[in-house]
Amino acid sequence: MYSNPNNFFGGNAMGPGAPQYGAGQPQQQQQQQQQPDPFAPQPTGFAQAPLQQQYTGYPGLQAPQGQLQPQFTGYGQTPQQGMATGAPPMPAIPQQYQQQFQQQQTQQQQPQQQQMPFAAAPPQPTQTLAPPPPVKPQATGFSEMAASFHAGGGARSQPSAAPRKANTVPNIRLSFITAPDQAKFETLFKSAVGDGQTTMSGEKARDLLLRSRLDGDSLSHIWTLADTTRSGQLHFPEFALAMYLCNLKLTGKSLPPSLPDNIKNEVSSMVDIINFSIAEESGSASATSTNAPDFGVRQNTATPPVIQHPQPQPSSSQLLQAQMTGFPAQQTGFMGQGLQPQQTGMPQATGYTGPRPPMPPMPTGFGSNLSPNVGPGGMIAPLNAQPTGRPGQWGLVNTPATGLPNIDALQARMMPQQGREQQDYTTAGLQGNAVIPWAITKDEKTRYDALFRAWDGLNKGYIGGDQAIEIFGQSGLEKPDLERAWTLADHGNKGRLDLDEFAVAMHLIYRKLNGYPIPNQLPPELVPPSTRNFNESLGTIKNMLHKESDFRKNSGASLLPQKTGVSYLKNHSFRGTGGASGNRKDATVFKNNDDAVGYRSSARRRVGNASPRPESPASVGSNEELSLDQLRKKIKEKQVLLDAMDFADEKNMEEDDILDRRDRREAEELYRRIRRIQEDIDNHPDASPIGGDSEAERRALKRQLQNLTDKIPELASQVRKTEKAIADARLELFRLKDAKAHPGSAAAIVGTGPGGAITESDRLKARAKAMMQQRTAALTGKKIDVTSDQDAEKRLEEESIKARTEKENNERMVRDVEDSVRDFAKGIEDNLKEGGQDSTTEHEKRRWEDALGVEDEVRDFIYDLQRSSRASRIRSQDRQGGRKATQEPVSAEAPPTARVDSPASISRTASPAAPPAAGGSYSSYKTPEERAAFIKQQAEQRMAERLAALGIKAPTKPGETAAQRAEREQAERAAKLRQAEEEDARRETERQARLAEEQGVPPPAVSQAAKPEGKKPPPPPSRKAAKPDDRRAEEELATKKAEEERLERERGEQERATRELESQAKAQEDELAKEREEADARLRALEEQVRQGKLKKEEEKRKKKAALAEAKEKEAQLAQRRAEIEAARKREEELRRQLEAMDDDSSSDDEGPEQITPQASTPTMNDSHIVNREPERQPTPPPAPVVSPPQIVTSSPPTEGESRNPYFRMMSHSSDASPATAPAPPVAPPVAPPAPPQPEASTNPFHRIAQAPAPETSPVPVTRRRPDDDGWGSDKDEEDEESDDDRPGGKSAAALASILFGTMAPPRPLSATGDKSATSPTVSSPVAPPPESASPPAASPSAPPPPPPMPGSFPSASPGPGAPPPPPPPPPPMPSAGGPPGAPPAPPPPPPGMAPPAPPPPPPAGGPPAAAPAGGRPAGLLGQIQAGKALKKTTTRDKSAAAVAGRVLD
């Protein structure tokens, strides 16, 4: 029965939607708890029993006061008995409670008293009885918490018998001193002031301050700063400030001249709190403080029913005992566990929670709400987004990397739960050692906000002290820690915590659970933004109020503001400067003015609109009160006033007329000045053009500029290509000239490098050729002039350097031109951009140039000014047209006649003819045709100026004679003059008419009639207007006369100035005409000089070309003669050799192929080429020499074989390529079939074997001679082989290779297949096929050699259709070596150089080295060899072979 209402009470009090314990609802709690009559005694008795025991302990400071303890003790016992009737088990509870408290409080009494030395005594509304001593320490913990929450509230709730110390010093922290210092100063202040006093007298303060042993000046300054109220007494904050200043001085720091604003505001605020609290304390001593958890009220009201209702339950005593056992721990914990005592309340809570197992239903209301939230994070998820609005203001930080351990457990424990009152909370499971930052993390804020909303069921926006005791107590911390956390979080000692402050308190608790001490002062990271901003705003308002009070005090305005007229309202603005502004009246300076009469409408008293308005009775007395004389007097006075008004009006009108005339004169003067300035602009040579630049024109110019800029790279590339071609041509020309001047030099070397440069490979080839020539000369016995190629190379290098230098200079010039053009284009583009119009310039242009948005008079003036400016430009252009007439363009779209017909178009199209100084520009033309004509004219003019600077006469227009041009220019000038005269005449007429209208000189009546139109004010009364009209007319006549005289003078001056300008213009025209004639003469002279120079250059070129052609012709003839001589000589040798071969054919029939094959190898071919190249060095290479037709016909077999045999094709290419490198006049190039040049010879050793296979005959004896000497062996080897002369090829490796691989090679080269029909009769002579097949290989190994077979050798060498069949085919078709090496007779041994060519050794050994001995033999050497001369005597080969052997010729 009792548990239900009890539960209902608990549910209401602790539910999320109900106010919490001690939330100012003690009566409601009592009513709910006590359904029967014993309502009043029940709370009284209940509160006295346990509450007073805890209260006895609660006032920890009041331990020495014995009255309080007996008061509580006795009172507690009495109601227990009275309440025992309602609940029998209750009487035993206090005794056990007292025993438990004796054990706990004896341990806690001393520490609690030390922790809260300034705690206020708890309120006790009942009489004091003697309690047991242990209850006092238990209450000490509660008094400590209450002291931290109250600002003197404990004393107010205490009966009058209790001391009033708490009222003297509010529990407010001063920021400029530390907490320990404030505690010391408070103790000292209380000891000096005594009980019940709030201020310290000046004498006591002086005694205390003198103990600091500071000098008098310092103490005087300290007193001045500390006594902020100027009352001669010190409140506690002022005393603390004085002690703080003394400490500053003692530590060696200087005293500030004035207090900082924050210190001054703190001190004044605390002083005001102390002064305001005095009246409240005297008014109601038993009133409880609303700024802290209300422990006293809950003890007196809420707790008794809680204990009484559970008493009927049989198990209540057991539960109470268990709770008791829990309560001591809770109490010790409530210094440590904190908030359970809140539920158990004060000691109330002990009895309340202890005996109340049914109380769980009270949290059952919470339990229902909290059961879903018990799980960690139950309400966190939906509220995660809520703190996101705060981080930017509060500086929330991210969760540390280590996480937030036990935060979920803390949240789960502190959520409203069922049965929390019975639990004994400890820190077990919540403690940790995590790194927790000072600032609140976002995760923490989310959880704390969820916890706050769970407890704030009614959405009041705050958590009261009772709820805080219950919530924080569940953390298991001791009471002092929780009290300090509450004190730091409850800013302003409001007694409740809002959302941010609750988060701060929870964060401090969480830090404490992780081993961090609770600070003495809240760090800046934890100050909520609302608190911080509120403090700043409070400081600002306080400063404003201080300044205002000082201003009022100093100015004396505080005495009688209505008399001084000083308005306080002006100084109340947050944004104002504080100074007086204007004489505006407001409520602070209001004073009634009897003279100020309010408006009173009389319209309702009028009968009709025509009725006069009656005079206001407030200002005029009633007519009935005035006599007739008074009325007449008033009428006279009014008449006088009216006359004065008329005079004033006339005077004002005259003044207005004078001002109007002056303004008109000033305007006319401005007009004249503007016209003069415009004329100066038009006539000045450096004046900027007139006319607006349209955006379309600007864009067109930009596009044109871009197109021209894009052409620059292409032009530069073309210039560079031309420069390169010029340099190459110069080098080639120099080579030709040098070869002509030095025929025997090595300048004939053709460079294969870049740009025709001679590379090292070219030099190696040249040296190899020269050495071959020397060896050939040694063999033939001819003398060859060996010239060093150093001079030629040096000359060519110098010329190359010159050409390269000139090319680089030209390239630099081209780059400079490119850079300058780019800079110029960039400048033009920047000018075009800068000239762009923005909105302001466009508006100004439309207003002052297009006359939009101006008055009619100004618009007419603008149009007239534009017309005069245009006419002036035309005249100036015509004056200067004599000099620039040749450059005036004729627009293709508008012929001259059209220009004459259309003056406007004339003025626009003719202006381009004027130079820029005349004022015309591209922007002054409105149509595309005019602009195109202007651009064309400007381009022609600039081109003419440049040509004139170069001495070249400017070209005239095509299709226009001088007479036509003169007529056109004359017609244009006449049209311009006529148009200008018409414009001047019309402008002068308009000006005269305008002056006549404005001044009214010619027709005075008209001017008088026109004048009053808009200038005269309403005329004055007619009765006195005659005289002013006469005076005004006289003044106007005088003014008009003066103005007319002045105009006449100005007209004369203008005429004189015009005549002077015309004379100056004429003189300028004469000077310009003279200058033009002189320029024409100079141009003609320069043009004649240029023409003569061109003729001379052309004549010189023709002479040079003729001389060069003659020289070439002579050289060609000389080369042709030499070629003919050489061909005849070689033809003779070839015929002689063939005859000898025919004689010996029968004896050497078997060995012929072996002997011929090596003889037809590469050395023979190279030999012949070297011999043939000897005469080629002398002249420059002429065209192909003339050769006999039979020689050309014999070249068909090689051509035939060229299309099938790949090796032969390669060798024929190399032989054909040789003429490209060193063309020789005696050689017949037409003989060689055309093929792409192949300077590189094949290095494949089998290449020669395949090209020179042995015929299918009986093998020749094999020799074991080593081919390492490549046929250039020593004399000893040659002597050993003398006995084998009858077998020329037997002892050579080439012969051995040919024998071994003869069957492996193709049976016959494809080049010789076509010869079977022609050579069939001579099959018995094996000499015929080998020469055919061997002739191609002869050319392949050596790239340098000249064209293939010489003409003299082909008729006999190739038994083609055109060759006579009887003679056997000779050895290889070499021009000069065909005779000797190819001798078929067996007896003569082959020369040493003949054998090596075919074997596999590298081509250098078998190529050019072997060619020297065989190639240089003249025709007479064959007879000597046949006579028995040994070839070993030719020792010169060894010397030359050593120099060239092993070299690879590219």
Swiss-Prot record:
Residues 72-83, 1156-1169, 1314-1323 have a biased composition (Polar residues). Residues 1417-1434 form the WH2 domain. It is found in: Cell membrane; Endosome membrane; Cytoplasm, Cytoskeleton, Actin patch. Component of the PAN1 actin cytoskeleton-regulatory complex required for the internalization of endosomes during actin-coupled endocytosis. The complex links the site of endocytosis to the cell membrane-associated actin cytoskeleton. Mediates uptake of external molecules and vacuolar degradation of plasma membrane proteins. Plays a role in the proper organization of the cell membrane-associated actin cytoskeleton and promotes its destabilization. The keyword Transferase does not apply. Residues 1141-1153, 1276-1285 have a biased composition (Acidic residues). Keywords: Actin-binding, Cell membrane, Coiled coil, Cytoplasm, Cytoskeleton, Endocytosis, Endosome, Membrane, Repeat. One of its GO terms (molecular function) is actin binding. Component of the PAN1 actin cytoskeleton-regulatory complex. The keyword Cell membrane applies. Pfam families: EH, WH2. It comes from the Eukaryota. One of its GO terms (cellular component) is actin cortical patch. Residues 181-270, 444-533 form the EH domain. GO terms for biological process: endocytosis; endosomal transport. InterPro entries: EF-hand-dom_pair, EF_hand_dom, EH_dom, WH2_dom. Its main location: membrane. This is Actin cytoskeleton-regulatory complex protein PAN1. Residues 622-741, 960-1148 form a coiled coil. Belongs to the PAN1 family. SUPFAM superfamilies: EF-hand (SSF47473). The gene is PAN1. Residues 1-140, 600-625, 788-851, 865-1450 are annotated as: Disordered. Residues 788-850, 965-997, 1026-1101, 1110-1140, 1265-1275 have a biased composition (Basic and acidic residues). It is a peripheral membrane protein. Residues 214-249, 477-512 form the EF-hand domain. Residues 15-37, 59-71, 93-119, 902-924 have a biased composition (Low complexity).
